[in-house]
C-alpha cells in the first residue's frame, strides 16, 4: 500500500481508468490457488494505495477568491509577534454556506497597536470574510512543501484576511470540544507544574509539540531524540501501564482490556485527532482488541494493520516525519531485538536488563536513522549513549505527568505530584540542553537510493532468520551483508554527485537568493529574507559555501543568513559592497555578520573593478565604485558579472535604475534588478546588455508583464516557474523551470 500511495502521488488522475482495469484483472487472481490468491491480494493492496494517492494528490478544491467563511478554532492561536501575523487552524469550515470536507489554514495580520481579537479562543466558532487560496507545493529543490504539510493535517485550502470578524454561538462541534479541553488541560498543567514543565507535558501528553520553544526542540534533534516530543506508542504505553495498575481490582482480563479500549479512543479524540496520538492509540487498541479475542498478538502484524488503517483514511501521512519515525522505530525494535533477546535472557540480573535496554536503544536509533537523515540532515553521535538515560527519564516524567493530569480536578491533591513534575522536568530539560550544546553531530546530505539500500542491507543482516547450529557460521554469513550495507550508508557523508556548471535562482517571493555550482565549488548570491529553502538545499546536497555574496544589507537579501547559520552550514568567505554599512541597512543583519565572524567566516568589502576568482569562473564587480556613498542601500547594491563555461550572467541585486548604466555590459542572461520593478530595470539597460534571457525573482504578476513589454528576450519569473535552473557548458546554456520539472 505504501508503494502504491507513493506512486499515486506522481501520476495524474487520467490513470484512474487503468487502475480500475488492473484491479479487475487482479481480482481474477483471487479465484486461483493459495499463492495466486496471495499475489492477487498484494496487487489489489498496491492498486488501492495508488488510487488513494491519486485522489489525495488531486483533490477537488473550491474556487479561489473572497468568501464568507465560518469555522471552529481547532487549536491554539499562533501569534508571530515580530511580524504581527496570526495563524489559526479552522475545522467544520463553510464557504458561502457550503460545508467543505477539509480544514483551512487561516492567516491575517494585526497592526502595531492591535491585540488578538477576544473571539479567537480554542473551540470558538467564528465568522469572517476572507480570501480563499490554494496552497502552493514545493517551489525549490529540497524546499519546503507547504501544500503537502497541510495535506498531512487534512487541510486543503488557505484563507487570508479577517474582514467582519465576529463570534458565533457555539454549536455542537467535536473539534471545538476537543480544542477547548486541550486548551484547558494545557493551561492547568502550566498552572500546576510551572511554565516549562507545563509546555513539555502538553507536548508529550496532548500532542501540542509547538508548545515547546524552538531552541529546546533543536537540542532534542541534536541528540537524536526528537521523536520523544511527539505522542507515540511509547507515550501511550505508559498510559496503558497506568490504566492497568488502576484496574488491578478488576480480575477478569478481557474486561480490563474492554475497559481500556474506550479510554484509549477517548484519549485520541481529546487530543483533537492529533495524527501521532491517533497512530499510537491505534497500535495499542489493536493489541487490546487481540487480547479481548484471545488471539496471539504479533507486533509485526499490529504494525502493518495500524499503518494500513491510518493510510486508508489519511494517505498523506506516509510523507510525514512522525509517521516515518514511529514505524521506523517500531519495526527496528521488533526485528532487531528478536535477534538480541536470546543473548540478553542468558544474562541474569542487572546485566541482562542493561543488555536489553541497550539493544532496544540501539534498535530505536537505527530505526529512526533514515528519517533523521532525511528531515534533519545530521547523525547524532551520542544517540545510543544518551538514549537509554533520557528515555528512562522520560518514562519517569510521563508517569508524573499522567498522575498530575489525572489529579488536577482536586487541586490540593495535584500539588505534590505537580511539584515533583516541575523539578523532574526542569532537570530533564537542563540535561537535554547541556548535552545538546556539546553533542557532536555529523552533517550529512539527504539519503539517496544507495543509502536506503545500505540501511535495508544492515537491517536484513540484523534480523533473526537463517539460524545455524554453528553460531559463528551464522554470523559469518551475515558479515558481508552488514559490511556492504555500512559502506553504502557511509556515502551519505560525501557531497551529492554533481558535475558541470549550474546557476539556480531560487523562488523566494519578493526576496533574492541564488546558488552557482561548479563541480565541488559553491557560490551563493544573497540569501533571501527567510533562508529555509536555501539552507535545506545546501544541507541536502552536503554543500559548504565557498563564497557568499551579499549585494546589500536589506533583510530580503541578507536575512536568510540566519537559517544558514542555524543549520550549521559552513560559510568560508563573504563579500559585500563598499559602503554597505554606511547605507540604510536593516539592523537585524548586523548580528548575522557578527555570528559569521565568530564562526570563522572572512568578511570583505569589494568595489568596481575587483575580480574574484572562483573555481574555473570569474566574478567581476561592476558597481559600486570605490568610495561610493548613498543613504539608500539599493543605490549602492552590488552588480556582478559572472563568467563561467563561456556564458555571462549579469546579477544586479536591487540596483536602482539611475545607476544601472554603470553596470550595463553585454551578457547572455540578466537577473532583473529590484524584483523587476520599473525603478530597477529599464528598457535602456536591457538594450545595452542585450541578453537572450531575463530572470526575475518576484511574487508579483505584473513584474514579468512589465519586462516582457520592454525586451524581446525570454523572461522567466520565479512566480511562474518556481526555481529557475541554468545549465552551462561550452558557451551554451539551457534553462529549466522547477515547476515544469515537478
Describe the residue ranges of each PLM region.
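Residue-level signal for inorganic ion chemistry
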Residues: 4, 71, 322, 368, ...
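Membrane-interface helix/helix-cap signal primarily in integral membrane proteins
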Residues: 44-227, 535-536, 544, 581, ...
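Aromatic-rich juxtamembrane segments at the membrane interface
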Residues: 152-283, 288-289, 573, 648-653, ...
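Hydrophobic alpha-helical segments of integral membrane proteins
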Residues: 174-193, 200, 208, 216, ...
Amino acid at each position: 500500500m505504501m508503494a502504491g500511495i507513493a506512486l499515486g502521488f506522481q501520476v495524474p488522475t487520467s490513470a484512474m481508468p487503468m487502475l480500475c482495469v488492473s484491479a479487475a484483472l487482479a481480482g481474477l487472481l483471487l479465484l486461483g490457488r493459495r499463492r495466486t490468491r496471495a499475489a492477487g491480494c498484494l496487487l489489489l493492496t498496491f492498486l488501492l494505495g495508488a488510487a488513494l494517492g491519486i485522489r489525495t494528490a488531486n483533490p477537488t478544491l473550491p474556487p479561489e477568491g473572497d468568501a464568507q467563511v465560518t469555522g471552529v478554532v481547532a487549536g491554539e492561536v499562533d501569534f508571530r509577534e515580530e511580524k504581527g501575523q496570526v495563524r489559526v487552524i479552522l475545522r467544520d469550515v463553510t464557504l458561502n454556506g457550503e460545508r467543505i470536507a477539509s480544514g483551512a489554514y487561516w492567516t491575517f495580520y494585526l497592526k502595531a497597536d492591535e491585540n488578538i481579537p477576544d473571539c479567537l479562543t480554542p473551540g470558538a466558532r467564528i465568522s469572517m470574510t476572507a480570501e480563499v487560496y490554494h496552497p502552493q507545493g514545493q517551489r525549490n529543490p529540497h524546499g519546503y512543501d507547504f501544500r503537502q504539510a497541510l495535506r498531512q493535517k487534512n487541510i486543503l485550502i488557505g484563507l487570508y484576511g479577517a474582514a467582519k470578524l465576529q463570534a458565533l454561538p457555539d454549536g455542537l462541534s467535536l473539534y471545538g470540544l476537543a480544542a477547548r479541553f486541550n486548551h484547558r488541560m494545557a493551561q492547568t498543567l502550566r498552572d500546576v507544574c510551572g511554565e516549562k514543565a507545563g509546555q513539555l507535558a502538553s507536548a508529550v501528553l496532548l500532542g501540542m509539540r509547538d508548545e515547546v520553544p524552538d531552541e529546546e526542540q533543536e537540542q532534542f534533534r541534536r541528540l537524536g531524540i526528537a521523536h520523544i516530543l511527539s505522542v507515540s506508542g511509547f507515550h501511550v504505553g505508559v498510559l496503558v501501564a497506568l490504566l492497568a495498575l488502576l484496574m488491578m481490582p478488576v480480575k477478569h482480563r478481557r474486561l480490563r482490556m474492554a475497559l481500556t479500549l474506550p479510554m484509549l479512543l477517548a484519549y485520541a479524540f481529546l487530543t483533537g485527532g492529533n495524527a501521532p496520538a491517533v497512530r499510537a492509540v491505534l497500535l495499542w487498541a489493536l493489541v487490546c482488541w487481540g487480547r479481548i479475542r484471545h488471539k496471539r498478538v504479533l507486533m509485526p502484524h499490529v504494525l502493518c494493520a495500524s499503518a494500513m488503517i491510518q493510510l486508508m483514511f489519511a494517505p498523506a501521512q506516509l510523507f510525514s516525519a512522525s509517521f516515518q519515525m514511529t514505524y521506523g522505530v517500531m519495526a527496528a525494535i521488533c526485528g532487531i531485538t528478536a535477534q538480541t533477546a536470546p543473548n540478553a535472557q542468558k544474562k541474569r540480573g542487572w546485566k541482562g536488563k542493561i543488555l536489553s535496554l541497550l539493544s532496544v536503544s540501539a534498535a530505536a536509533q537505527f530505526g529512526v536513522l533514515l528519517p533523521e537523515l532525511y528531515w534533519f540532515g545530521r547523525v547524532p553521535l551520542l544517540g545510543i549513549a544518551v538514549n537509554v538515560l533520557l528515555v528512562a527519564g522520560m518514562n519517569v516524567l510521563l508517569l508524573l505527568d499522567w498522575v498530575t493530569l489525572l489529579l488536577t480536578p482536586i487541586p490540593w491533591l495535584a500539588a505534590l505530584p505537580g511539584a515533583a513534575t516541575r523539578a523532574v522536568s526542569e532537570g530533564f530539560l537542563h540535561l537535554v540542553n547541556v548535552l545538546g550544546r556539546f553533542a557532536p553531530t555529523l552533517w550529512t546530505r539527504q539519503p539517496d537510493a544507495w543509502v536506503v539500500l545500505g540501511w535495508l542491507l544492515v537491517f536484513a543482516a540484523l534480523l533473526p532468520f537463517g539460524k545455524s547450529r554453528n553460531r559463528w557460521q551464522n554470523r559469518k554469513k551475515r558479515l558481508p551483508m552488514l559490511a556492504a550495507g555500512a559502506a553504502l550508508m557511509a556515502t551519505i557523508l560525501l557531497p551529492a554527485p554533481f558535475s558541470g556548471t549550474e546557476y539556480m535562482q531560487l523562488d523566494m517571493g519578493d526576496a533574492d537568493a541564488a546558488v552557482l555550482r561548479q563541480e565541488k565549488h559553491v557560490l551563493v548570491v544573497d540569501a533571501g529574507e527567510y533562508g529555509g529553502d536555501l539552507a535545506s538545499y545546501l544541507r541536502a546536497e552536503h554543500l559548504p559555501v565557498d563564497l557568499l555574496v551579499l549585494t546589500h544589507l536589506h533583510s530580503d537579501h541578507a536575512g536568510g543568513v540566519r537559517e544558514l547559520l542555524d543549520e550549521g552550514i559552513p560559510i568560508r568567505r563573504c563579500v559585500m559592497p563598499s559602503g554597505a554599512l554606511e547605507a540604510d541597512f536593516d539592523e537585524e543583519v548586523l548580528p548575522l555578520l557578527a555570528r559569521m565572524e565568530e564562526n570563522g567566516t572572512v568578511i570583505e568589502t569589494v568595489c568596481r573593478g575587483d575580480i574574484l576568482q572562483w573555481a574555473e569562473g570569474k566574478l567581476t564587480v561592476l558597481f559600486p565604485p570605490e568610495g561610493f556613498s548613498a543613504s539608500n542601500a539599493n543605490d549602492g547594491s552590488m552588480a556582478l558579472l559572472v563568467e563561467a563555461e563561456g556564458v555571462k550572467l549579469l546579477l544586479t541585486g536591487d540596483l536602482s535604475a539611475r545607476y544601472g548604466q554603470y553596470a550595463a555590459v553585454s551578457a547572455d542572461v540578466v537577473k532583473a534588478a529590484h524584483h523587476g520593478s520599473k525603478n530597477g530595470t529599464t528598457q535602456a539597460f536591457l538594450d545595452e546588455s542585450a541578453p537572450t534571457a531575463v530572470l526575475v525573482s518576484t511574487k508579483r504578476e505584473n513584474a514579468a508583464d512589465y519586462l516582457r513589454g520592454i525586451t524581446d528576450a525570454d523572461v522567466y519569473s520565479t512566480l511562474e516557474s518556481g526555481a529557475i535552473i541554468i545549465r552551462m557548458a561550452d558557451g551554451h546554456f539551457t534553462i529549466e523551470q522547477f515547476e515544469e520539472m515537478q
